[in-house]
Amino acid sequence: MSVFVTTLQAVLALLGIGLLGFWIIGRRRVPSDTLAFLQSLAIDIALPLLVVANLISGFSPQVYPDWWRMPLWWLGFAIVALALSLSASFLVRKEIRSEFTISLFYQNGLFLPILIIGGLFGQDNPYLVPLFLFVIFHPSVVFSTYTLFFGKRIQKEKLNWRRIVNPVLVATVVGLIIGLVSANEYIPEFLITIVTMVGAIATPLIMLILGGNIYNDFMYKEDNNKRWYIREVVTFVVIKNIVFPLVFLALLLLLRPDLTIALIVIIQAAVPPITAIPIFVERCGGNRKIASQFVVASFIFSILSIPAVIYLFNRFFPIPF
């Protein structure tokens, strides 16, 4: 049970920071427009530097000889997740099938796993580098494919290459090259300190932003429309937070990869959707309200479901804390 408690404490610590962001925006301590600046600071600067800092300090082909397999594991994960999402979409009405499917498929593959792994093992751990390699293409795929879920409901959009070739992708490639050629030995210590210190603000900043975004998306409605999609939301939470992790755990037991790969895969399967889902849905002319309810309900339920999944996972893949 200690694994459950340890994971629960890590999730609750993250929740506390998220609630602080929720409270700050809800009480108007700062304008909600400030979130746009903080989001840019976190995603375009702090998070890429966090990636670079970990790759510079922790990656080398000697330590991770099979590093190139991580993107392939992600591809396999994405294929299975897409198949599950499309299959489960027939459980809901056709009018909301696109919103249901996209929310199932696009997991919060980078932010929450960073926070969960950091909460469980501290910032200096052997799992962050494989995580960054695992999700190297994930943000690019999200930004280049989300319109496909809505088919003829939207006009064809031009690809935004700034989102596809995003700062996290660039940072991962740069850090990977530095590690492969052992150039980190020639980087001045003060530059590594700067990169590490700025990257360290990414974790709390991301949770503050998540809390603020949830308030803006869920609590503040100009049209005062309070419709709740209880049946659809319950169905979504059961599939996303329970069925997905159990299916992937069964596959892990069948394939028996090493602990690092297995842990990253099960965390990817257990986390809720990315918080940008309501924005994607609205941009595609879908039902933003139900998408917001999917995201928030999954986040709330994950407070208990993630520790439970990690506890069950630990029974088959013992985690060295």
Model regions and ranges:
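Alpha-helical transmembrane segments of multi-pass small-molecule/ion transporters
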Residues: 1-321
